[in-house]
Amino acid sequence: MCCVSWNWVLACTFLLIFLSWWNCCNDRISVNSGVPGMAARVAGAHHVVLTEQDELLRLLRVNLAANAEVLTHEIEEEKGGIVARPLSWGIEHTKEYLARYGDEKIDVILSCDCIYEPLYGTSWKGLAQTMELLCLANPKSVVLLAVERRNEDGIDKFLAFVEKETMLLYRRDEVTVGSSKNRLEVYHLHLENILKN
């Protein structure tokens, strides 16, 4: 799902947390939004996969092409780089994705401002299911979820769903206030059997 442009305060907070995780992983990242994934690549992530719904994939690829110069590292190791792939949220779509790309390991899953019921409805259920399936396929992976709190945003419903309906655990890592005076939060999600940091 295409996510709205997100506040730069959130972006900076999110990237600082991401960079601390990046230092302790193997740099294989899956992202459902172009900007955070491109920022991760510029920050040095080795292999980044940007995912989007089929109908928005062309725009994502145009953005990648427009930013190719800054996204390409001088020395590319085997299977490094940044690519865009189709992925819609939900069990069926995620299973199809994993059937095709399941050999690629994921260390970090980034999700930025993808939960907002007035715009996306209850698609957060499919998002939670997708996160769980990606983590089950990559048991040591973590999800970094950045959200902006707004009226009736659905974030509390998402977190309750994650807690009751998935094998994921979550904790809130960061809270700050954005330029629109909304609370910006970053959550860390992982499978139950992974040690908490």
Curated annotation (Swiss-Prot):
Coiled coil: none annotated. The keyword Ligase does not apply. Pfam families: Methyltransf_16. It is found in: Secreted; Host nucleus; Host cytoplasm. InterPro entries: Methyltransf_16, SAM-dependent_MTases_sf. GO terms for cellular component: extracellular region; host cell cytoplasm; host cell nucleus. Keywords: Host cytoplasm, Host nucleus, Secreted, Signal, Virulence. The RxLR-dEER motif acts to carry the protein into the host cell cytoplasm through binding to cell surface phosphatidylinositol-3-phosphate. This is Secreted RxLR effector protein 48. The lineage of its organism: Eukaryota, Sar, Stramenopiles, Oomycota, Peronosporales. The gene is RXLR48.
